[in-house]
Each structure stands twice: as C-alpha cells, then as structure tokens.
From Swiss-Prot:
Annotated compartments: Plastid, Chloroplast
Residues reported in the UniProt entry to bind a divalent metal cation: E265, D266, D289
Cofactor note: Divalent metal cations. Prefers magnesium or manganese.
Stated name of the protein: NADP-dependent malic enzyme, chloroplastic
C-alpha cells in the first residue's frame, strides 16, 4: 500500500493544494470556473503578476494585469522589501493580513521563507496589539463569529462557512487574551493567527482550518468604543454560557465528524480546565495554553539538563503563576518525572512549588484554593513574597507564567544565582511587556550564568564580551506538528502520553551547535522539519488505539512531510 499525500490525512483536497504539482494543471473552481476579475479577487487562486502568458489568455486576464510576468520568488522579495519599510509592528501585521486576503499562497510562502522575522508579526507579540485594536483594523471576516444571538442556530450558521472539509478549529471566547485580559469579540485575532501557523509551520491546508470566536459579551471595557465589533453587554456565565458551548461542540461534531481537532484558546482559567475535562472524553480537544505550553516548556527543560546536569527528579521547581499555563506545565513535568522514575505522581508533584497572588501555595490555604491549585499545596509555613519563597525553597528552576511583567526582580534573580551555578529561569508570559524579566536582566543579574527562555522573543544579549542567544519557549514549536500528527493518524482523542512524546521529539531536535550558542531550543528556521518529527505523536495514537487511519505508515516522519501543504503556485488549465 502506498501512502501518498493526495488527500492530506484523508480529507478531500478541494483546491488541489497537495495532489497537484507545479507542472500539473487544475481547474480553479468556485461556484463556477473563476476567470478574469473574479480570479484576481479570489485569494485561493490569485497569483498576481505571476500568472503566465497562457493563463492570462485562457482566463480573460489580458488588460487586467500589467504585461510583466514575474516569479513567485520575486514576489516574495518585493513583499519583504515592502513590509520592512514599516517601522511599526502593527503596520506590518496589517500588511500581512491584507496579503493573506489577496494572495493566500504568497502569504504562506512569505511566512515559511521568513519565519523567524515574520512570526513575531503574525503572532506574539504583535497579535496582542492587533486584538486590542481589532475593531479599528477589521476589514473582512476571516472566521466565524457565534454570539448569544445565534443560540439555537449554531448548526445552521456553521453551514455558512464556505469550506466543508474542516480538520482544525481554533476557538476562543476572548476572556483571557494573552496577558491582556478580556478583549471580547476582538480576540478573533488569536484563532486567525494560530491557524496561520498551523498551515505555515505544520502544513495543514488553509482551507481545512476554521477560526471561531464565541461572543458572550465582555467586561464592558469597550462600551464607549464605537468601533467595537462584538456584543455590548456583560459577559454571560453559568448555564447560559454552558448551553452555548454545548451547542457549539455538538454542532461541530455533527458537521465535521469526530476527527476534527478543536483547540481551545485563551479561555479564562475557570472555563479552560472545565472545558478540557468536560469534552476531553467525547471530542478531539486540545488546550494550547495548558497542554501546548506545558509540552514546549518540558522540552526546554529536558534540553537544558544537558547543560546543567541531573535528571528532572533531581531538580526543584518554583512557579510564579498558578493558572492554566503554570499548573499545566507543572502537571506535565510531574508526569514525566513519574514516567522516568516509577515514583507515583502524587510524590513527584512534591518537587514542584507554586506562588500565586496570595503567596506560596501551602496546605494551610487548602480550603480557599481553586481545585486546580490543590495538588500543589505542600507542607510549609506561609510565604507572601516571591523573593522569600525563592530563598526558602531554593529552587533550581524558576518559571514565570503569571502575566505580571517585571516580577523577576534583580533580588529574585540574584537569589537564584547564589545557590545555583546555572539557574534555569523561564519568563514565559506574553506579550513582551508582560514578561517576568527581560533576557538582558536575566543574564546581567546572574553574571551570565542563567539558562534563560521567554515566551516572546528577545534580541541576543552581549554580556562581558559574550553573546547570549536566549531560547523562546513558543507554543508554535509544538501545536502545529502536534495537530499534524493527530490528523495524519485520524486520532479521535488527545492523551497525555502524546504530549510527552511531543516534548521528547522537540528536545531531540536541539543540536550541539545550539548549546554552544547558549540556547537550549532549536531555531525556527527548521520549524517544518521539527513539526514533522513532532508529528510522531501519531505513533502514540496508534499504540493507544486512538488512531483510525489504517494501516499505520511505516515511516511517520516521511509521511508527515509528504502530507504538508505547499504554497507553490499551481498551473491553471
């Protein structure tokens, strides 16, 4: 049996995105054959000045384009020159979004070929500002909006989306956008950005991706903003909220089947954990803030141990922030320690401590703690300040996921450096303004000894004549390849063991050259190859009996690479 990429994981390749090659011809179908002006206005098919002489004759494009014919590569060069002329990141973001709406293949080729430069533009940190100003810059719908007005009609509204073969949905309710709080309906920039990365980095076909925003109101911060695009009412909670989410999840499964991946994105803590627990046994669901963040941080830690020495179980961890990201990371670390040592999970959790807004999480606070914090309450006297917790616990690893900027103060970092030769410090909060400390602060305050990673990128730092290239613990290392692995295997559920496999696969991609440059996370320049290796989570899906696409390919990495979407232009009949 030959495994080929003609259908990208078993879903019909509507636009010939995978089955055709540059030398093969396809028909640009919309409701009818697109030609002339309509072809230029269709982002799936538009090639701009790259239309050949024959295509211009065949599809009535003569006179609608200047006479020159240019290559795809020259278009990329031209667009990069244009984007680099903008000094303001939001202007670059808007230019990229305009390109995506005009020429989809050029957008993805541009992003793939220049991923390290453009990733901070199409996603964090720039996407945070884009969400804050989404009402001002909104031009054209890029996904589906479900508000309380659509309650009882979600199944019908889903049918309004033109693509019918959906593989991945990223959905948010806008309540906790990055570290920026409740942005309501304007959180749509997050699903749009995430799915752009699913396609560019993980090779999922753009036509198989659906961004969704659930609008149940907001905190009324936009009540006086005349350009706000969402409901102008207080956020719905309780039964009203649950019923809308139930209807949405049921409708998605009815429309697209059991194998569609639903990624929950930027839900508030109280909903994020509940939704994952509620639907995890009945749907293929994934929470990037809880599971994706955990997987990439665990990979970074596993790689960092090559520089520090020792196993995970020999280290002590202190977290600032006990929300969905912090507790998700902690649980995956505890699971990996349990897997490595055979020690029960309840015991490995005791190596991990947490500080929230009220101080160190200890057993004397148990009755007042939210359910997801209780596993991390250990025997210790109460401690209010982070620096005192550091001095008392003496962690070897300090991880920030608090969303509170500049909380890793000079005193905190210096305390870490007093009892650690190489303190591991991960300041993970996004965007950059909310990072617990900067790369420069971590290196200078630790006298160049820290092993540092952040959620958003920082420029290389020079300290005492040495250049330090800090790692970026960006979820984009994990979720695109993770999603690809689920799709190519036809997985019907996500299992924690898959997250451990993804972490191990990413850690294995860190080279000796990376270590010599002071980073324990591989560069984004190789991200599509990294994603193909992370897609080995498919093997775990087969092992656990959760895969439905049979038989299992012999070489999953090669199969994953063959299934990846290519932005190369196609020739039209």
């Amino acid at each position: 049996i030959r495994h080929e990429s003609t259908v990208t994981g078993g879903v019909q390749d509507v636009y010939g995105e995978d089955s055709a090659t540059e030398d093969q011809s396809i028909t640009p179908w919309t409701l009818s054959v697109a030609s002339g002006f309509s072809l230029l206005r269709n982002p799936h098919y538009n090639k701009g000045l790259a239309f050949s002489e024959r295509e211009r004759d065949t599809h009535y494009l003569r006179g609608l384009l200047p006479p020159v014919v240019i290559s795809h590569d020259l278009q990329v060069k031209k667009m990069m020159n244009s984007i680099r002329k903008y000094d303001v990141p939001l202007q670059r973001y808007m230019a990229m979004m305009d390109l995506q709406e005009m020429n989809e293949r050029l957008f993805y080729k541009l992003l793939i070929d220049n991923v390290e430069e453009l990733l901070p533009i199409v996603y964090t940190p720039t996407v945070g500002e884009a969400c804050q100003k989404y009402g001002w810059i909104f031009k054209r719908p890029q996904g589906l909006f479900f508000s309380l007005k659509e309650k009882g009609k979600i199944h019908e509204v889903l049918k309004n989306w033109p693509e019918k073969k959906i593989q991945v949905i990223v959905v948010t309710d806008g309540e906790r956008i990055l570290g920026l709080g409740d942005l309501g309906c304007q959180g749509m920039g997050i699903p749009v950005g995430k799915l752009s990365l699913y396609s560019a980095l993980g090779g999922i076909r753009p036509s198989a991706c659906l961004p969704v925003t659930i609008d149940v109101g907001q905190t009324m911060k936009f009540v006086d903003d005349e350009f706000y695009i969402g409901l102008r009412q207080r956020r719905a909670t309780g039964q009203e909220y649950s019923e809308l989410l139930d209807e949405f999840m049921y409708a998605v499964k009815q429309n697209y089947g059991e194998k569609v991946l639903i990624q929950f994105e930027d839900f508030a803590n109280h909903n994020a954990f509940n939704l994952l627990a509620k639907y995890g046994t009945s749907h293929l669901v994934f929470n990037d803030d809880i599971q994706g963040t955990a997987s990439v941080v665990l990979a970074g830690l596993m790689a960092a141990l090559n520089l520090v020495g020792g196993s995970l179980s020999e280290h002590t961890f202190l977290f600032l922030g006990a929300g969905e990201a912090g507790t998700g990371i902690a649980e995956l670390i505890a699971l990996e320690m349990s897997k490595q040592t055979g020690i029960p999970l309840e015991e490995t959790r005791k190596k991990i401590w947490m500080v929230d807004s009220k101080g160190l999480i200890v057993k004397s606070r148990m009755e007042m703690l939210q359910h997801f914090k209780r596993p991390w309450a250990h025997d210790h006297e109460p401690v209010q300040e982070l620096v005192n917790a550091v001095k008392s616990i003496k962690p070897t690893v300090l991880i920030g996921s608090s969303g509170a900027g500049r909380t890793f103060t000079k005193e905190v970092v210096q305390a870490m450096a007093t009892f650690n030769e190489k303190p591991i410090i991960f300041a993970l909060s996004n965007p950059t303004s909310q990072s617990e400390c900067t790369a420069e602060e971590a290196y200078s305050w630790s006298e160049g000894r820290a092993i540092f990673a952040s959620g958003s990128p920082f420029a290389p730092v020079e300290y005492n004549g040495k250049v330090y290239a800090s790692g970026q613990a960006n979820n984009a290392y994990i979720f695109p390849g993770f999603g690809l692995g689920l799709i190519i295997s036809g997985a019907i559920r996500v299992h924690d063991d898959m997250l451990l496999v993804a972490s191990e696969a990413l850690a294995d991609e860190v080279s000796q050259e990376n270590f010599e440059k002071g980073t324990h996370i591989p560069p984004f320049s190789n991200i599509r190859k990294i994603s193909a290796h992370i897609a080995k989570v498919a093997a775990k899906a087969y092992e656990l009996g959760l895969a439905t696409r049979l038989p299992q390919p012999k070489d999953l990495v090669a199969y994953a690479e063959s299934c990846m979407y290519s932005p190369a232009y196609r020739s039209y009949r």
